[in-house]
């Protein structure tokens, strides 16, 4: 992404890109309060959403968060969601320097340093920060990204530079998206009173009021009179807003996808019950002694590769923010010509430090799955029921009752989530959803290689832990055996031969078998279970009508899917959990539409219907 060209002028940050100050150089702090952060009233509701065009140095955000935290909880929303779009990246050290020069640093020190600790690299994406009762989604993209987002703001901060120097931030296209992402009575806050901005706001249903500005003649406020109606050509992927009888959630499965989800749900006040068929944690694919957190490296502009990168960096940031983990990096090796070609196209990617056939991923590293999963469940305060093998459910009067193999019945759940990994194949039976169960075996060796970070080529090698070194993993679609195979251990060892001296003698001290869940297109399957009969009837003519407005999708009930994470569940589970929480709790969706469409459970059927099949 573009980096901001910034200097100090009159002791105030000045943009060389727009030939304008970032804010009022005489009294920026009080102007931000007057125009934006103190110009509206909090509502005592579940979620309050503020959206901003132009994050800049983050002053509006920190002022808003400070006001939110200083307000008595009974007089403010339970959760604050703050979504801010920024196209020009400011370096971490430069941000700190700005606050110090402006003498704002001490006032915001604690919040600012928490923010800077997890500040991402200069790469497009949506990055979430966790503050007390507040989620900040920092969107590093051009403002046109709004057409890819889905939320309904309570308040908009239309910031940015002067309209005559940055007209895109106030033009008709932008105001249409602002209106689309607003609800009745949404308030617009802006320093500008430009006539063309007023005209655009009125065109899309805002009531515009002129009011006294900060140390100037006037500014405007605007309020949306009625929610905008617009045509949706892809309504089959649209969200359905949930209505819940209670806040009880049942999750089937106790692996990493379940653990991250349980933690995220707990932040929203849900009561979570986990049902696991085994007698303890760590018996499935999420129970390895060691593993790696890394990313696929594909060519630029490949959706799967870009999603893998975003999943990876957000997982790394999540584990650092929530579990205080530290990562030392991971080295990926190009072991064939195709991989080398991919590496060569990614030399400008800030996530990958590529040298010849090696890529160093600084945000990656070794993970300890059993410990990580256990810690997340403990933080979530979820109740885990072991030896509960799920069989079926009934959905009546807005609640689920669950039947288990041991004849136990659990009931009164408003939400049911399948997070059972490879076992999903035995419970989900859509015609076009092809799931596969892939066996993987890791090998436990006596320590043989001293490395501070994982190495990944045909197979991976983890650093030594507790006098044990893990390598892996095999890949077998045809074998469903739970027993370790000697030939798999041999294959794992052959696949790491490039890392060893020919005379190295390896001692196998154990192995572990797990099963991965895959979809046919390698994207995870995450979202609401859909009504297959409705889809087949309503969208049967998509071959001819795909460019016309579509009827909104119909889902079957509050049943959600969270599986097909493949071998990278420790990366993808974080975005999956956030997205599911947004669907369940009616929050801003934290993914761009292109990714929502890519992971949607109905995508396979829609592709077929578009072909007229």
From Swiss-Prot:
The protein's matches in InterPro entries, at most eight in alphabetical order, are given as: FAD-dep_OxRdtase, FAD/NAD-bd_sf, MnmC-like_methylTransf, SAM-dependent_MTases_sf, tRNA_MAMT_biosynth_bifunc_MnmC, tRNA_MNMC2, tRNA_S-uridine_synth_MnmC_C
Descriptive protein name? tRNA 5-methylaminomethyl-2-thiouridine biosynthesis bifunctional protein MnmC
Which species is this record about?
Answer: Campylobacter jejuni subsp. jejuni serotype O:2 (strain ATCC 700819 / NCTC 11168)
Keywords for the protein's UniProt record, in alphabetical order: Cytoplasm, FAD, Flavoprotein, Methyltransferase, Multifunctional enzyme, Oxidoreductase, S-adenosyl-L-methionine, Transferase, tRNA processing
tRNA (mnm(5)s(2)U34)-methyltransferase: annotated segments: 1-225
Task: Report residue spans for region: FAD-dependent cmnm(5)s(2)U34 oxidoreductase.
Answer: 252-613
GO CC terms for this protein?
cytoplasm
Provide the protein's localization: Cytoplasm
Q: Which GO terms describe its biological process?
A: methylation; tRNA processing
Recorded hits in PANTHER family, A to Z, give: SARCOSINE DEHYDROGENASE-RELATED, TRNA 5-METHYLAMINOMETHYL-2-THIOURIDINE BIOSYNTHESIS BIFUNCTIONAL PROTEIN MNMC
The record's GO molecular-function terms, alphabetically, read: oxidoreductase activity, acting on the CH-NH group of donors; tRNA (5-methylaminomethyl-2-thiouridylate)(34)-methyltransferase activity
Cofactor field: FAD
Supply the EC number(s): 2.1.1.61, 1.5.-.-
- Provide the family line: In the N-terminal section; belongs to the methyltransferase superfamily. tRNA (mnm(5)s(2)U34)-methyltransferase family.
User: What reaction does this enzyme carry out catalytically?
Assistant: 5-aminomethyl-2-thiouridine(34) in tRNA + S-adenosyl-L-methionine = 5-methylaminomethyl-2-thiouridine(34) in tRNA + S-adenosyl-L-homocysteine + H(+)
Gene name of this polypeptide: mnmC
Q: What exactly does this protein do?
A: Catalyzes the last two steps in the biosynthesis of 5-methylaminomethyl-2-thiouridine (mnm(5)s(2)U) at the wobble position (U34) in tRNA. Catalyzes the FAD-dependent demodification of cmnm(5)s(2)U34 to nm(5)s(2)U34, followed by the transfer of a methyl group from S-adenosyl-L-methionine to nm(5)s(2)U34, to form mnm(5)s(2)U34.
């Amino acid at each position: 992404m573009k980096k901001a060209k910034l200097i100090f002028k009159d002791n105030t940050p000045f943009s060389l890109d727009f030939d304008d100050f970032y804010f009022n150089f005489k009294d920026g702090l009080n102007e931000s309060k007057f125009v934006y952060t103190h110009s509206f009233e909090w509502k005592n509701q579940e979620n309050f959403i503020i959206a901003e065009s132009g994050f800049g140095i983050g002053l509006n955000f920190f002022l808003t968060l400070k006001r939110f935290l200083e307000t008595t909880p009974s007089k403010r929303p339970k959760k604050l969601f703050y979504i801010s779009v920024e196209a020009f990246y400011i370096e971490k050290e430069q941000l700190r320097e700005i606050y110090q020069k402006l003498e704002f640093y001490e006032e915001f020190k604690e919040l600012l340093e928490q923010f800077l600790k997890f500040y991402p690299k200069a790469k497009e994406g949506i990055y979430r920060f966790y503050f007390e009762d507040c989620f900040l989604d920092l969107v590093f993209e051009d403002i046109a990204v709004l057409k890819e987002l889905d939320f309904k703001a309570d308040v908009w901060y239309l910031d940015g530079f002067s309209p005559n120097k940055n007209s895109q931030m106030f033009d008709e296209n932008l105001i249409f998206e602002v209106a689309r992402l607003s609800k009745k009575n949404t308030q617009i806050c802006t320093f500008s009173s430009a006539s063309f901005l007023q005209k655009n706001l009125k065109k899309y249903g805002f009531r515009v009021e002129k009011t006294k500005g900060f140390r100037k003649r006037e500014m405007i406020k605007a309020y949306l009179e009625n929610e905008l109606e617009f045509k949706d050509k892809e309504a089959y992927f649209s969200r359905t807003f949930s209505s819940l009888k209670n806040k009880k959630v049942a999750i089937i499965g106790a692996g990493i996808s379940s653990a991250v989800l349980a933690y995220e749900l707990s932040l929203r006040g849900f009561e979570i019950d986990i049902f696991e068929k085994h007698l303890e944690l760590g018996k499935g694919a999420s129970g390895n002694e060691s593993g790696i957190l890394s990313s696929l490296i594909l060519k630029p502009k490949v959706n799967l590769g870009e999603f893998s990168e975003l999943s990876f960096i957000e997982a790394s940031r999540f584990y650092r923010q929530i579990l205080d983990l530290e990562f030392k990096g991971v080295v990926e090796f190009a072991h064939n010509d195709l991989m080398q070609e991919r590496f060569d196209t990614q030399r400008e990617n800030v996530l990958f430090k590529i040298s010849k056939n090696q890529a160093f991923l600084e945000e990656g590293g070794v993970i300890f799955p059993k410990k990580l999963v256990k810690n997340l469940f403990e933080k979530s305060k979820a109740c885990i029921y072991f030896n509960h093998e799920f069989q079926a459910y009934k959905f009546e009067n807005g609640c689920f009752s669950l039947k288990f193999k041991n004849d136990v019945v659990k009931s009164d759940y408003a939400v049911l989530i399948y997070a059972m990994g490879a076992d999903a194949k035995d419970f989900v039976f859509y015609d076009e959803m092809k799931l596969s169960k892939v066996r993987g075996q890791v090998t436990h060796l006596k320590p043989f290689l001293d490395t501070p970070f994982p190495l990944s080529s045909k197979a991976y090698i983890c650093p030594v832990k507790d006098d044990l070194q893990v390598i892996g993993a095999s890949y077998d679609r045809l074998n469903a055996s739970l027993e370790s195979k000697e030939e798999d251990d041999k294959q794992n060892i052959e696949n790491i031969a490039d890392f060893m001296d020919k005379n190295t003698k390896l001692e196998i001290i154990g192995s572990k078998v797990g099963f991965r869940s895959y979809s046919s297109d390698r994207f995870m399957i995450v979202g609401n279970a859909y009504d297959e009969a409705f889809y087949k009837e309503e969208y049967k003519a998509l071959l001819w009508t795909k460019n016309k407005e579509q009827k909104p999708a119909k889902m079957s009930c509050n049943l959600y899917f969270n599986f097909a994470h493949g071998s990278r569940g420790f990366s993808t589970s974080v975005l999956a959990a956030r997205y599911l929480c947004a669907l369940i709790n009616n929050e801003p969706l934290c993914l761009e539409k292109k990714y929502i469409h890519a992971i949607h459970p109905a995508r396979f059927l829609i592709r077929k219907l578009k072909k007229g099949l």
